[in-house]
Amino acid sequence: MSTAISPLAPTDVPDLPEIAGVRLATAAAGIRYKGRTDVLLALLDEGTTVAGVFTRSRCPSAPVEWCRARLKDGHHAKAGLALVVNSGNANAFTGKTGRQATKLTAGIAAKAAGCKASDIYLASTGVIGEPLDATKFNGVLETLASEAAPDRWMDAARAIMTTDTFPKVATARVKLGKAAVTINGIAKGAGMIAPDMATMLSFIFTDAPITATALQSLLKSGVEDTFNAVTIDSDTSTSDTLLAFATGAAGARGAPRISRAGDPRLKAFVKAFHGVLADLAEQVARDGEGARKLVEVIVEGATSKASARKIAKSIANSPLVKTAIAGEDANWGRVVMAVGKAGEPADRDKLSIYFNGIRVAKSGARDPSYDEAEVSKAMKNDRIQIKTTLGLGKGRDRVLTCDLTKEYVAINGDYRS
């Protein structure tokens, strides 16, 4: 966790309301950091349903494997459940020791929460390859269970931070049937961000009565154009985890129970749910390690949406493009390079490129009306849009990233120090 807040941090941070059936507590367990909280315990009432999406890394962390096993058949807790998140140690690439640590953590948490170990969800973030000493949770989780309260959202968001410079929270309130329901979300992530099914860590909570199957469908569809459309450094983490919990408490106020993601009564909820995911995903991009500029990459006129996504990712992940943005240089030649290397259909002589709405290249060459002074002024903004039109079809997609600065190198060069 950095002491200097990113200049791209949101200026308007919402107060997250309480959600019936959710209680939170945090503590400093000394996992890696000193003088700050590094453990989150979330307690969820009986009847809570759960859904999750995770990294596609072939080297997943032990907590990811643990959660996947819990969700195999769609989880519905009969006696309540709990979520334990620690920062500072990813418990990844830790072999048998790591798997034993997850079992020990789940056992300690189950005793504290009064449920079964199979009703415990785990997530870890931090250094890869170092064993996690789960005995540090002894006593800590019991205390947290007794202290858990429904209004600790900001504390929860802070406890899961690593190199993040600000806590990431989002909320929405919407009608489901005749009842108002709430959606709250927290996230962390600033580096090793190129999610594939999730982000580094993100947790969504709602009081809507939704079955695990329907919630899983909502989550899978929601991440595609939110968390999966964000990249900081092209590195997909071993620990990417996005979990959603629905307590169903709004059912007592008249909210209908939803068992199908396509239920028309869910339309407003789906929009709000995706909005929370999009808000959190953008905050992750804004907090990219060392970032000074938020970058939106748009690709239009591709042969398909999938092709546009791949080209947009090629541009967004290019160190040459990202350093040019950091240097406030509208270097469209580097964008051309990134389009060309993407391995997708592209016609050089149909290519046009825009920086913040100013066309700098047209039909495969520099725009005849190019004005260096106008473009240079636009590049000083802290939000940069790069739009590329291919002229081949109707495929369009959008990816968020940030610039690449000297600070990124410094942060990651000193990460284990």
UniProtKB/Swiss-Prot annotation:
Annotated site (Cleavage): A198, T199
Main location: cytoplasm
Binding-site positions, substrate: T162, K188, T199, E289, N412, S417
Subcellular location: Cytoplasm
Gene Ontology cellular component terms for the protein in this record: cytoplasm
Residues annotated as site: Involved in the stabilization of negative charge on the oxyanion by the formation of the oxyanion hole: T125, G126
Record InterPro entries: Arg_biosynth_ArgJ (IPR002813), ArgJ-like_dom_sf (IPR016117), ArgJ_beta_C (IPR042195)
GO molecular function ontology, one term from the record: L-glutamate N-acetyltransferase activity
UniProt keyword annotation of Oxidoreductase present: no
Assigned EC number: 2.3.1.35, 2.3.1.1
UniProtKB keywords: Acyltransferase, Amino-acid biosynthesis, Arginine biosynthesis, Autocatalytic cleavage, Cytoplasm, Multifunctional enzyme, Transferase
Pathway(s): Amino-acid biosynthesis; L-arginine biosynthesis; L-ornithine and N-acetyl-L-glutamate from L-glutamate and N(2)-acetyl-L-ornithine (cyclic): step 1/1; Amino-acid biosynthesis; L-arginine biosynthesis; N(2)-acetyl-L-ornithine from L-glutamate: step 1/4
Superkingdom of origin: Bacteria
Top-level enzyme category: transferase
GO BP annotations listed: L-arginine biosynthetic process; ornithine biosynthetic process
Active site, renumbered: T199 (nucleophile)
Reaction(s) catalysed by this chain's protein: N(2)-acetyl-L-ornithine + L-glutamate = N-acetyl-L-glutamate + L-ornithine; L-glutamate + acetyl-CoA = N-acetyl-L-glutamate + CoA + H(+)
Family per record: Belongs to the ArgJ family.
Functional summary from the UniProt entry: Catalyzes two activities which are involved in the cyclic version of arginine biosynthesis: the synthesis of N-acetylglutamate from glutamate and acetyl-CoA as the acetyl donor, and of ornithine by transacetylation between N(2)-acetylornithine and glutamate.
Subunit structure: Heterotetramer of two alpha and two beta chains.
The protein, known as: Arginine biosynthesis bifunctional protein ArgJ
Gene: argJ
